[in-house]
Each structure stands twice: as C-alpha cells, then as structure tokens.
UniProtKB/Swiss-Prot annotation:
Organism in which the protein naturally occurs: Saccharomyces kudriavzevii (strain ATCC MYA-4449 / AS 2.2408 / CBS 8840 / NBRC 1802 / NCYC 2889)
Designated gene of the protein: AIM32
Record protein name field: Altered inheritance of mitochondria protein 32
Transmembrane segment boundaries: none
Family: Belongs to the AIM32 family.
C-alpha cells in the first residue's frame, strides 16, 4: 500500500481532476533504490565519456513551465525509425533539415508568445497519422486543441498567428527561459492581444498522451533511457489507449527519466479540458507503479515534477 502524504503542493488546486499525493512506503523504497542503482549503472555503462553520469541521488525539483499550448511537430517515418537519436540535433531551433527546420521558424514567429511550448515527437503507435519521409506537409499536433494540423511551410507565419489568436493571459516566462533555469524567479502574467484567424481547421483526435523524453543529442541519458521506458510501456501493456511518443528536450535531463501525461477530463463531452502531469526519475522498473497509481487518482511524490490544468 502507498501512504498518503500530508504535504500540499500548489498545483493541486488547479487540476480538473482530484489527485491524492502519495509516498512510497519504506520497504518498497528500499527495493526501488536497489533496482534504481543497478539500472543507473547499466545506463552509465552505455553513455559517451562526454556525458555526465546518471546520479539517482539528485533531488527532483517540483517545477514545470507554465504554458497554454503544447505544439508537437510529428516526425516522419514509422515507429522503428530513430529520429530522436539521429535527426534531432542538440538544439532543434538550429536544425536546417526538413521538417525540423520548421521548429526554429515557428518559434521565431511566436517569440512574443512565451506560453506556447514547441517540441518534436516520434510516435510509437498508430492512433495519430504521421507524415512520410519527404512529405510536403508539416504535421503539428496541438494540445489542448487535440487536433492534428497539416501545414505548408509557406503558411508557418500564419499558423503561428492562428496558434496565438484571441486575448490570453500568457506567462512572461518562456519555455526557453525555463530550460535555462529562470523558472526559479517569480513570474507575473501579462495580457497579450493576437490576430483572429480561422483558416486552419485540423482533425480532432481525443486521446490521452504519454510522452517520454528521448532526445539523445541533447543528453545521452535521456536518449538511452527513453526507449527503455517506451519498451516498458509496451511490454507491461500500460495505458495502451494513450498516444505514445518520444519527445525532444523538456528540461530535467540532469536527472532524466522525464515523462509527461496529458489526461483528458470528460473527453466524451469534447470539452478539451485536460491535466498536464510531469514526472522525472521514471525508470522502467517503477513505471508500472506510477501508471497504476495515476489511473487511480494518485500521484507519487518521489517522481512528481509538477503540473497544470489546460483548457
């Protein structure tokens, strides 16, 4: 049995669902610690000499970016391809190759809109269509729209305006600021005015998401652990109805094992309300425990980075 923690985290009040925060019991923690030590040693044996080793003793910060939308550029190729290891360079903003050059362009058009995260994703199942190699269309999945948009490269600037439409309360802290550590500074919000464009319709795909960081050239720890965690999802048949994918850098590569869950709230009503839950120090041997508790409305604090609700 897991025991309920008495500690209250600030994010709890903002979820659409009610989650209970729990801690691992001491006996289970001892077993987990032994498994973690063994696994980290095996990962470190695979790492290049230039990569800092995986240290399971690093403290996990309870911190995530504050954002309004998550834009995922879908990588081409089937699930056996390895763009996360080969095509995703250290900084995708500087990638000059299609389709990844679209990330830097889109981010430049959104430079005054810090509440939008942009990542590449390599899908590991077939619920959402993926582009073919050399496809003329760019495939973007946008959360919480829960829509797949097929965009021409010449329409990227207009698409950026579309993503940024309306009047929203956008956080001053950008995702890039978050990645370099500025999230430690208290942030205010500002009202941002945008164009109103309705050109882009998109196709709706209402499913939860499980995203695992596997950005090898950003940090080999994530690049080695990401596929192991994906294999654990598949071998243990965990959250099989979720979209599953490897995602580019989302911070936290120092401790690695980063997993993001997007959980829809009353999806049958097409409300597009969902909870964003970020975890770190997730290993193949503790993934099942994490997922089973999450499905029962319980968050394991030892792996919890933070989260927000989205509409």
């Amino acid at each position: 049995m897991l025991r309920t923690t008495v500690r209250t985290l600030r994010q709890r009040a903002f979820f659409h669902r009610s989650f209970v925060h729990v801690n691992l019991p001491e006996l289970h923690s001892a077993i987990q610690d032994a498994q973690t030590t063994c696994y980290c040693q095996s990962i470190n044996a695979r790492l290049p000499s230039t990569t800092d080793p995986l240290d399971p003793q690093i403290k996990l910060p309870h911190r995530t970016p504050n954002y309004n939308k998550h834009v995922l550029l879908v990588s081409p190729g089937d699930k056996l391809a390895q763009p996360w290891k080969i095509a995703w360079n250290h900084n995708l903003d500087t990638n000059l190759n299609r389709p990844y050059n679209a990330i830097g362009k889109l981010r430049s058009y959104l430079r005054n809109s810090p509440g939008i995260l942009i990542n590449a994703v390599h899908l590991q199942n077939e619920f959402v269509p993926r582009p073919k190699e050399g496809d003329k269309w760019l495939f973007f999945f946008v959360i919480p729209d829960m829509k797949l948009y097929k965009i021409r490269e010449t329409d990227l600037e207009e698409f950026a305006s579309f993503l940024d439409e309306g009047v929203v309360q956008a956080p001053r802290l950008s995702f890039q600021d978050y990645l370099i550590g500025k999230a430690k500074v208290p942030q205010e919000t500002q009202q941002v005015h945008h164009k109103n464009l309705t050109k882009f319709q998109g196709d709706i795909f209402l499913r939860d998401w499980s995203l695992v960081c596997g950005h090898y050239k950003r940090d080999a720890k994530c690049g080695e652990m990401g596929p192991d965690i994906i294999a654990a999802f598949q071998d243990e048949k965990l959250l099989t109805d979720n979209n599953l994918g490897l995602i580019s850098h989302v911070g936290g590569h120092v401790f690695a094992g980063n997993v993001i869950f997007y959980k829809l709230f009353k999806a049958e009503n097409a409300l597009n309300k969902l909870d964003s839950l970020w975890f770190g120090k997730v290993y193949p041997h503790n993934l099942k425990l994490l997922c089973e508790n999450l499905e029962n409305g319980k968050i394991i604090d030892e792996m919890y980075r933070g989260g927000i609700s989205m509409n």
